[in-house]
A protein has these predicted regions:
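Patatin-like phospholipase
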Residues: 1-57, 65-321
Length: 321
């Protein structure tokens, strides 16, 4: 069932109680499902909900960079056009030939990252974090230590390439003596980083793969499902802890049964997400709630389900201190 989930502490008032609330957007990883975030962002911006800071990893970092450069509908139109035109070969150039060749020569990755670099260049004119109108934090992971490494200044492209460098699929990014890879490896929904500054509410755009996203058909499906369980447990823990400090609003998303290499159907998914989140946000802003659970003082989450449930047919960079 699609709904908007809102987690707050016992002392938090309703959404209209603080019209100048300091707002963070957290954009998860998600690969080809990153297209859903465009519809989610459009629903937010149309309702005057603009971020004071954005935190993203992998596909969410790319979308976050474009949003932070132009936090308006025009900027989202540009980003949406990039996603709508994306094809598998744009991101994974060479296809099976490239994969086979890299396996035979014992490469550490299956695909070069030139395709990703081209997508980044088309998605935003920004070349540096200094070009952004809204502060952005890009989450990556240190392959050797497992530490999260967060970028917030310097050249933008290396940070985005590192954040999307899925281990074994794309080459690692070497920076400052570290080998950096996709931030989703350790933190698929980098919620906790939103609390490093003065923030009152956090909108979470979580489009990361879950274990139930698609049937288990191949060995890769088994690996992805197991990986998803581990990452989701991290997010649930972070969400429970963070909701003691800020209001957390998790946006719904449409169902997406595409394979991970399939970039078709982007326009339909953007439209479905826009409609779904628009209805949920209207209900959130109106305070139109259906039910409320126990408060957080008992260590439980507060969940609000909204009465209006839409029916959808989904067809040199320096790390932050």
């Amino acid at each position: 069932m699609m709904h908007l989930r809102r987690s707050v502490s016992a002392a938090t008032d309703g959404p209209e109680s603080n019209p100048r609330a300091r707002t963070a957007f957290v954009l998860s990883c998600g690969g080809n499902q990153g297209v859903v975030q465009i519809g989610q962002l459009r629903a937010l911006i149309e309702r005057g909900i603009v971020p004071d800071v954005v935190i993203g990893c992998s596909a969410g970092a790319l979308n976050g960079a474009a949003l932070c450069y132009a936090p308006n509908l025009t900027g989202l139109d540009r980003l949406g056009a990039v996603w709508a035109d994306l094809r598998t070969n744009d991101v994974f150039p060479g296809g099976k030939i490239s994969r086979t060749w890299n396996v035979l020569r014992k490469s550490t990755h299956l695909f070069p990252n030139e395709g990703l670099a081209g997508v980044i260049e088309r998605a935003t004119p920004a070349r540096s974090f200094a070009d952004l109108a809204v502060p952005l934090r890009v989450v990556t992971a240190d392959l050797d230590s497992g530490e999260e490494v967060v970028f917030c200044r310097g050249p933008l492209a290396p940070a985005l390439l590192a954040s999307a460098a899925l281990p074994g699929v794309f080459p690692v990014i070497h920076h400052g003596g570290r080998r950096l890879v996709d931030g989703g490896v350790v933190d698929s929904v980098p919620l906790w980083h939103a609390l490093s500054g003065p923030v009152d509410r956090v909108f979470v755009l979580n489009v990361s793969h879950t274990a139930s996203d698609r049937p288990i058909r191949t060995p890769l499906d088994v690996v992805m499902a197991s990986f998803a369980h581990s990452r989701n447990m991290r997010y649930e823990l972070d969400r429970r802890l963070a909701s003691e400090h800020v209001e957390i609003v998790e946006l719904p998303r449409p169902e997406d049964q595409r394979e991970i290499f399939d970039f078709g159907g982007g326009v339909e998914l953007m439209e479905a997400a826009h409609h779904l989140c628009g209805d949920a946000l209207d209900a959130y802003l109106d305070g139109d709630v259906l039910s409320t659970s126990e408060d957080h003082r008992a260590g439980r989450r507060l969940r609000i389900r909204f009465a209006r449930r839409p029916v959808l047919r989904s067809s040199s960079a320096a790390p932050a201190a």
